[in-house]
């Protein structure tokens, strides 16, 4: 008699020899070809549908604006200053917190 683990009952159950020697989850590869997934669509659209997002693309204009070599890195004024200062404060605070945590972890407690 051969046994195989039943995923339904979560116990060993009797099985045929061919089932018992086939690992669960691994089955022999089928010889038939799988169906084609990426085929040419049968219905071709005559015009390309374009979505109107919120207007024209502003990326090229912003690239020219931010890549000007005028020696000034905060080009949009107060929002850039606030973002820069917040980022630097969080970075420094996180670094200090990590260093303190490493120091405390490296010092054993006396009991």
Swiss-Prot record:
Q: Where in the cell is it found?
A: Mitochondrion inner membrane
Task: Please name the InterPro entries in this protein's record.
Answer: COX7a, Cyt_c_oxidase_su7a-rel_mt, Cyt_c_oxidase_su7a_sf, Cytc_oxidase_su7a_met
Residues crossing the lipid bilayer are: 79-104
Q: Which Gene3D superfamilies match?
A: Cytochrome c oxidase, subunit VIIa
Alphabetically ordered keywords of this record: Acetylation, Membrane, Mitochondrion, Mitochondrion inner membrane, Transit peptide, Transmembrane, Transmembrane helix
Q: What does this protein do?
A: Non-functional protein. In contrast to the protein found in other strains (AC Q99KD6), cannot induce the assembly of mitochondrial respiratory supercomplexes.
Family the entry assigns: Belongs to the cytochrome c oxidase VIIa family.
Could you identify this protein by its name?
Answer: Cytochrome c oxidase subunit 7A2-like, mitochondrial
Species annotation: Mus musculus (Mouse)
């Amino acid at each position: 008699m051969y046994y195989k683990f039943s995923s339904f009952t979560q116990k060993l159950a009797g099985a045929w020899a061919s089932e018992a020697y086939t690992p669960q989850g691994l089955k022999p590869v089928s010889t038939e070809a799988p169906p084609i997934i990426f085929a040419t669509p049968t219905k071709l659209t005559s015009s390309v549908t374009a979505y109107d997002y919120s207007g024209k693309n502003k990326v090229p204009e912003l690239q020219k604006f931010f890549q000007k070599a005028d020696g000034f890195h905060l080009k949009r004024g107060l929002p850039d200053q606030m973002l820069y200062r917040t980022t630097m404060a969080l970075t420094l605070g996180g670094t200090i917190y990590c260093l303190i945590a490493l120091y405390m972890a490296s010092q054993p407690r006396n009991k």
